[in-house]
Amino acid sequence: MLLESDTQLNQKSYYEASVLRRAPEPALAGALSADVLVVGAGFAGLSAAIELAQQGLSVVVLEADRVCSGASGRNGGQAIVGFSSGQAPFEQQLGMSDARLAWDMTIEAIALIDERIARFGIECDRVAGYLYVADSARKARLLENDMKILQRDYGFASEFASGTDTQRLIGSQRYCAAAFEPVSGHLHPLKYGLALADAARSLGVRIFEHSAVQAIERGATLLARTAAGRVTAKFAVLAGNCTLREHGPHVAPEITPRIMPVGTYMVATAPLDPALCRRLIPSNASACDNNFILDYFRFSADHRMLFGGGVSYSTMTPRRLAQTMGARMCQVFPELKGVPLDYVWGGFVDISMNRAPDFGRLGDNLYYLQGFSGHGVALTGLAGRLVAQAVAGQAARFDVFARLQHRQFPGGVLFRTPSLVLGTLYHRLRDLL
């Protein structure tokens, strides 16, 4: 059901409509061998493949659908420093020294995007700048305090505005405070992801689409099986996230209960007057509020408002999605009332229980990357670099994340959704305050 809903939700994606995909890669047939097998051709898997190939290793990537057909190719396009969890899990579990190291690596994650754009000549509408916004006095105080802590403990500076001064940063009466920082930003995720695949191919990586991994036999040499083929490898990286279990429930059953698929949705308006765009977001930054149920938005290169928000813990496609998302958008920007919505889409992302990324090993040679929790545009690139370093025997930075403890969702895989819905109802009420 999840895979069917995911495909259905992505049929009217602005991103898919604004790129020209190459012909599909063939499905795996027969037997292959490689130094490293990567499962999943999203940002994390492709990033790992690039880094591994740059080390001179032979790499095979198996993708169950098409390159970046999942969360990597249809997200908000916001490349953000930090973690969805905030710094608390890192400070509490690892101490301030490693918490600072983890934070600094998220700065590196943004730089890595720009490094790859420059090296491989990627055109993906990259724009720098990010706005955090708050819609109540309580949340404005929280935002200001968070920014002060980042400045004090991590040396990360931002520009804070409140009251009427907020309008200088964002042209919406809904918000009473905003913080701008120039490091994060936004891009066209599918353009970026398809270009990463091209970069991987240029380095000799072999990519197979429509090649879901159904099982992996573990040992000193790993053996992965698909419907029509098999791959033997010295190492493997699992980067399928919330769809990994759907294709191969027995591939890694010990880690799949630690993440949960959550539906999130977006709309794209018809192209707007550039002057209106400058009035609504003068810096052309991407933006996100600090509610538990987020609204996030930005402008595309062709002057469309791309507005995302809402979550669903069901695999069913929500009814009246266009009307619901359009209403949310117009609550933020009433000027957009009556503007046509040319595209409406959505799909599933993975979240961890504590919203911190979940990286680790299953034995000595099977690695996994999951739990990006809405910060995947930047963190997936970092994850790929770290896991490649670990495969090469330089695991210190990977192990900063691997030492984080992650709990399973209450109720396990089958009954985790009702438990999370109950918790979310509380936070929905908090968002109103």
Put a short name on every predicted segment.
Residues M1-V36, Q54:
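Extreme N-terminal leader/targeting segments of oxidoreductases
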Residues Q54-R74:
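Glycine-rich FAD pyrophosphate-binding loop
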Residues A34-V61:
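N-terminal Rossmann-like FAD-binding beta1-loop-alpha1 element of flavoenzymes
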Residues A111, R119-V127, V213, T221, ...:
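Active-site substrate-recognition segment that forms the wall
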Residues K148-I149, R174-F235:
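Helical element adjacent to the flavin cofactor pocket in flavoenzyme catalytic cores
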Residues R74-D104:
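Glycine-rich active-site loop/strand segments that organize a redox cofactor
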Residues L2-S18, S85-E91, E115-G129, V133-A195:
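Flavin (FAD/FMN) cofactor-binding and adjacent substrate-gating region
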Residues T315-L432:
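C-terminal catalytic lobe of FAD-dependent flavoproteins
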